[in-house]
A protein has these predicted regions:
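NAD(P)-dependent Rossmann-like dehydrogenase/reductase catalytic/cofactor-binding core
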Residues: 8, 47, 59-162
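Internal alpha-helical scaffold of NAD(P)-dependent oxidoreductase catalytic cores
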Residues: 1-77, 82
Length: 162
């Protein structure tokens, strides 16, 4: 509480969450959806939310994430539509994973979408959209790595979605 009070006194928002796991899932709903989709599409948050087909895919993936969260005992406090609207309001922002892709850096998708797919396995949740996007990201990561090796740039570790 003292940390939160100090941050608030400094003019920052710093709520103390009683159910941190629920709030983590709210964040993960966005990251596990928009980071991999942005890498596959090259699009900003607003563009993905405005395009009917990527918005539908994002909503489907979020529904899968919510099902996994519920089976894991979490109760995220935001609706899918509210999460999508929030992402769209962020505007023409490129996700950190898309920025990494454009900079030629390793893609850190294992901690993002692969973790959700692992939790789907543990909770016996189908999550076909999440799995399909993870598979496409895994192939992208492998293709990038092969291209770098063939170009003589040396192998760079890539945390791929599997």
């Amino acid at each position: 509480m003292k940390f939160s009070e100090a941050m608030i006194a400094g003019g920052l928002k710093c709520p103390v969450e009683q159910q941190i796991r629920d709030e983590m899932w709210v964040k993960l709903m966005g990251n596990a959806v928009f980071n991999p989709l942005s890498v596959l599409t090259g699009a900003t948050l607003a563009a993905m939310c405005r395009h009917p087909r990527t918005r539908e895919l994002a909503a489907t993936m979020m529904a899968e994430a919510l099902e996994i969260a519920h089976k894991a005992g979490a109760q995220p406090s935001v609706s899918i539509e509210r999460r999508l609207a929030g992402a769209e309001r962020v505007g023409e922002h490129k996700t950190s994973t898309l920025q990494d892709l454009e900079a030629g850096k390793p893609l850190e998708l294992a901690a993002i979408i692969d973790a959700v797919v692992e939790l789907a396995d543990l909770t016996e949740t189908d999550a076909p959209a999440m799995r399909a996007v993870a598979a496409a990201c895994a192939l992208l990561a492998e293709t990038r790595e092969a291209d770098k090796t063939q170009a003589g740039g040396g192998a760079r570790p890539v945390a791929s979605a599997s």
